Amino acid sequence: MARLPDRYNSFSALRERETEGVDYRVRVESRSSPVAIIAPHAGFIEPATSEIALTIANGRFSLYRFEGLDPARLHHELHVTSENFDEPIANDLVANSAIVIAIHGRADREDPESSWVGGLDTSLRNLIVEALRRDGFAAVARKKGEALAGASAGNICNRGQRQVGVQLEIPRGVRDALMADAEKLKQYASAIRGAIDEFGRVLSSGEDL
């Protein structure tokens, strides 16, 4: 079944009709870290992305979550596409972060097992794909022109200090499996953190990847 078009084309439009604390909430943990983990479609919009983002951040990285609060609401009702996502707290956090990773959920469809890793930060993207595969998780790099590639310059993941970021699209079946197995969730998050740490070391040293 085709996904319905988003009800709102910006957070500004959403805020005019929806009530914070009833329909949605914004949760942010700003830390002295160059890394921001964001989940702009969290809560009941794309289930489990909030928990996955929290586990990746692990009290170390800055964390942002925009959460839909009503389980009866449909995906399109509170989903603002990443190119149009203009919630001010998210904008500010991302603009002040050197490394940005956005956590999203996608439908299983033709590839129910692979995390799709996109975004314009191709070096970090590739490190995350490799790290997930090493730990036994299926992952593929998404490239410009492919669906859910996160390759638009306006995508919120690409609006950080370096104007590049990573977008992680996790299929529903994988999200459900991670929620059902705390150790597997920790392992998944740890693989991503390890890739971020490796990338951060190279970035601070000025070496080429």
Please provide the spans of the model-predicted regions.
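N-terminal catalytic or cofactor-binding beta/alpha core of small enzyme domains
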Residues: M1-L209
